[in-house]
């Protein structure tokens, strides 16, 4: 699949995901700056200061539910991998007390989990599926395509080649459980003093 085909498939996956969430009763809005301010974020593609990185890797959407709504971030990934920079920025978002759900899709499979429950496979392990001469370099468990001569010879002109890890599929939940898992999490996270004021449709 070419870069353009992957991009098109990823956009279709995200659109369907957000439509599915709306159908479940969630109110959903776009959040990622590549959707809301594409010209602005394109100027930041090489910026690595913290604010620019947070902007570049903002989750794709935000969603809420309830009479007095509670909210969460949602990221749509049409892949089984996570970029290192994205993972770090997601972690900072969660460390600040935010809820982030990442939904993965590929080959008609849709699965998800909360950021903190997702496990990543060290590159030293996932790389064992390939012959030694076909493996990319690994540093601190992250795979670095750009640091290999293989990348120079085979890369797509639009592919990023940034460090990544594969996601452990055993740490993900079937999408059919999404509504239940999210609503239960939002109930747990609410302040006890506000329990009588928050009502969910579940």
Could you tell me what each predicted segment is?
Residues 4, 59, 138-139:
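Intrinsic disorder/low-complexity signal
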Residues 1-50:
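Acidic-basic catalytic patches of nuclease active cores, encompassing PD-(D/E)XK
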Residues 80-86:
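Compact nucleic-acid interaction/catalytic patches
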Residues 59-80:
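Conserved catalytic cores of phosphodiester-cleaving nucleases, focusing on short active-site segments
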């Amino acid at each position: 699949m070419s870069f353009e085909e992957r991009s098109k498939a990823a956009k279709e996956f995200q659109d369907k995901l957000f439509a599915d969430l709306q159908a479940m009763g969630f109110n959903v809005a776009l959040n990622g700056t590549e959707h809301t301010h594409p010209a602005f974020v394109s100027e930041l593609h090489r910026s690595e200061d913290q604010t620019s990185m947070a902007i570049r890797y903002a989750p794709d959407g935000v969603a809420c539910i309830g009479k007095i709504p509670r909210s969460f971030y949602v990221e749509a990934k049409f892949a089984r991998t996570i970029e290192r920079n994205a993972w770090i920025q997601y972690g900072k978002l969660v460390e600040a007390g935010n809820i982030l759900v990442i939904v993965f899709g590929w080959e008609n499979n849709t699965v998800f989990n909360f950021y903190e429950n997702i496990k990543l496979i060290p590159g030293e392990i996932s790389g064992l599926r390939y012959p030694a001469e076909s493996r990319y370099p690994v540093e601190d468990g992250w795979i670095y395509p750009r640091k290999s001569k293989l990348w120079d010879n085979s890369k797509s002109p639009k592919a990023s080649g940034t460090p990544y890890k594969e996601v452990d599929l055993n740490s993900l939940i079937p999408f059919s459980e999404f509504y239940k898992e999210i609503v239960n999490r939002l109930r747990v996270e609410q302040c006890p003093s506000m329990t009588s004021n928050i009502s969910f449709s579940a």
